[in-house]
């Protein structure tokens, strides 16, 4: 499967790139953080244009960024808008707290209250009131297009790995894990 990184500098360009990627058979499109705004919101806006394509929000996450509980809530909104096609994609740098953040996101996408005892993001009785759209929770992807291998502390943390395609720098190979 192939994915595409959307890189346009304006929303009209993002829409055009997404539509072209869908028409060319891309399985997923990924919107990154940029001056255009939040990638989760931008990905949600593309949902009606590419009804059979996974919609990814690509985030270079660090501890000073969005708390995993807020990230889980925001991606739930994307998942509801796109009918269960959301992908939360993490870009480097990969740090050990990221594995815990992923675990907390997954816990908050499941029914009931989440209790998380981790050293970085302890949470007691947290609930994500809205539920993801489909039978399954949003997928987690790790962008390895600039790396040679997956860090050991993230083995098993993702559903998808994104690998580079040498012939197409704005594209990636999607590997299900």
For the regions a protein language model found, what residue spans apply to each?
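Active-site-adjacent structural elements that line small-molecule/cofactor binding pockets in enzymes
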Residues: 1-177
């Amino acid at each position: 499967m192939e994915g595409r990184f959307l890189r346009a500098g304006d929303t009209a360009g993002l829409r055009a790139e997404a539509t072209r990627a869908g028409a060319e058979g891309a399985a997923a499109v990924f919107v990154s953080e940029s001056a255009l705004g939040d990638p989760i919101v931008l990905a949600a806006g593309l949902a009606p244009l590419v009804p059979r394509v996974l919609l990814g929000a690509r985030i270079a996450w660090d501890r000073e960024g969005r708390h995993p509980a807020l990230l889980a809530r925001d991606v739930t909104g994307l998942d509801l808008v796109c009918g269960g096609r959301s992908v939360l994609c993490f870009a480097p740098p990969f740090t050990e707290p990221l594995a815990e953040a992923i675990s907390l996101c997954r816990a908050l996408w499941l029914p009931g209250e989440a209790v998380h005892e981790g050293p970085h993001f302890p949470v007691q009785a947290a609930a994500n009131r809205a539920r993801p759209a489909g039978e399954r929770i949003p997928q987690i992807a790790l962008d390895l297009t600039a790396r040679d291998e997956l860090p050991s502390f993230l083995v098993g943390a993702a559903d998808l790995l994104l690998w580079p395609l040498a012939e197409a720098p704005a594209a990636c190979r999607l590997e299900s894990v």
